[in-house]
From Swiss-Prot:
Pathway: Cofactor biosynthesis; pyridoxine 5'-phosphate biosynthesis; pyridoxine 5'-phosphate from D-erythrose 4-phosphate: step 2/5. Substrate binds at S45, T67, Y259. It holds the Pfam family DUF3410. The active site is at R209, E238, H255 (proton donor). This is Erythronate-4-phosphate dehydrogenase. CDD domains: ErythrP_dh. Keywords: Cytoplasm, NAD, Oxidoreductase, Pyridoxine biosynthesis. GO terms for molecular function: 4-phosphoerythronate dehydrogenase activity; NAD binding; protein dimerization activity. Transmembrane segments: none annotated.
Length: 381
């Protein structure tokens, strides 16, 4: 049995080699010839699964994507050909939420505001948007949710109309899939008309899919130079990046928002376990068992946390400025976008760190943000 896997999928070779012969190749450049005599295909979002890719897939029975998004896969085509498909919904939600939170904490420091004075509008209330809302509201921040499809399906959460959210939110963060048809298409959801409505003191973050924002219109909006802030982890035509847009962005990164080590391990193990079930195999993987020990496993707090403490704690684990600096330094080199993703550092999630302190430290909200917490009277570092 041959299993073709994106070479950037962590832990995949060790896991899938238990089931058959593993072939590793760059996901973005897979061709139809690569799928000859292949039984299973394991990919990430850079691989487009379509009729052209499957033209010579004479034995393919299973496709798994170790990502939450699925817009890169023609699922109707797979159903037509009798090929089983699975994804990893929610695998990256923690990493994306922590990316957004890092952006907020750094911008608050740079622009001189408190995150607790800002209203965050979350467009897209799926796995990522919902988790982000839970984290932010858990520490006392005000959140607005917008998701017309979920609202129409009877989701009982409180939703805000897009027009209202755009007016009331200080921060607008995007977490939708990319859709081009239907009643609520998200392609160019944030277009020139909407961008012109946004105030100079508002912040726009896109960590969803590049084409959700019209990048040409965004560039024109930022060129007005009125203080409007935009952050992009995804670009409309990635891996190509508009070099005129780049210097106008507060932060820019190469589609790595969800690239926490835990998230990547979850994605790989989710599709591995699904493939084992498909085969009727007894093998099973737990993502926690794959992870190394955190560099800073425990931090002791001597007093109740405040915003500055929160900034310090979160930046110990992840500071978006590190990725932004590397992106701007290296993006001009050939193939840099994919190389930065391929060789991305072992970023951890907040859950890798335990915060310890007395009852007067009020650690419960930090647990909602994702940290492990331990109430104790003495330092136990």
């Amino acid at each position: 049995m041959k299993i073709l896997i994106d070479e950037n999928m962590p832990y995949a070779q060790a896991l899938f080699s238990q089931l058959g012969e593993v072939i590793l190749k760059p996901g973005r450049t897979l061709t139809a010839d690569d799928l000859i005599d292949v039984d299973a295909l394991m990919i990430r979002s850079v691989t487009k699964v379509n009729d052209a890719l499957l033209a010579k897939a004479n034995r393919l029975k299973f496709v798994g994507t170790a990502t939450a998004g699925m817009d890169h896969v023609d699922q109707a085509l797979l159903r037509e050909r009798g090929i089983f498909f699975t994804a990893a919904p929610g695998c990256n939600k923690v990493g994306v939420a922590e990316y957004v939170f890092s952006v907020l904490m750094v911008l608050a420091q740079q622009q001189g505001f408190s995150v607790f004075d800002k209203t965050v509008g979350i467009i897209g209330a799926g796995q990522v948007g919902s988790y982000l809302a839970k984290c932010l509201s858990g520490i006392g921040m005000k959140v607005l949710l917008n998701d017309p499809p979920k609202q129409a399906q009877g989701d009982e959460r409180e939703f805000t109309e897009l027009e209202t959210l755009l007016k009331q939110a200080d921060v607008i963060t995007l977490h939708t899939p990319i859709t081009r048809g239907g009643e609520w298409p998200t392609h160019h959801l944030i277009d020139a008309a909407i961008l012109e409505q946004l105030r100079s003191d508002q912040i726009l973050i896109n960590a969803a899919r590049g084409p959700v924002v019209d990048n040409a219109a965004l560039k024109a909006r930022l060129q007005q130079g009125d203080g409007f802030t935009a952050v992009l982890d995804v670009f409309e035509f990635e891996p190509q990046v508009d070099m005129e847009l780049l210097p106008l962005l507060a932060f820019a990164t190469p589609h790595i928002a969800g690239y926490g080590l835990e998230g990547k391990a979850r994605g790989t193990t989710m599709i591995f376990n699904s493939y084992c079930e498909f085969l009727g195999s007894a093998h099973c993987a737990n993502p926690a068992s794959l992870l190394p020990k955190a560099p800073v496993p425990k931090v002791y707090l001597e007093r109740a946390w405040d915003e500055e403490t929160l900034r310090t704690l979160t930046q110990i684990i992840y500071d978006v400025r590190k990725d932004d600096a590397q992106f701007r330094r290296e993006i001009h080199q050939p193939g840099a976008f994919d190389l930065m993703r391929k060789h991305y550092w072992d970023r951890r999630e907040y859950s890798a760190v335990t915060l310890a302190g007395g009852a007067d430290c009020h650690l419960a909200p930090l647990a909602k943000l994702g940290f492990q917490v331990e109430v104790c009277d003495e330092p136990t570092i």
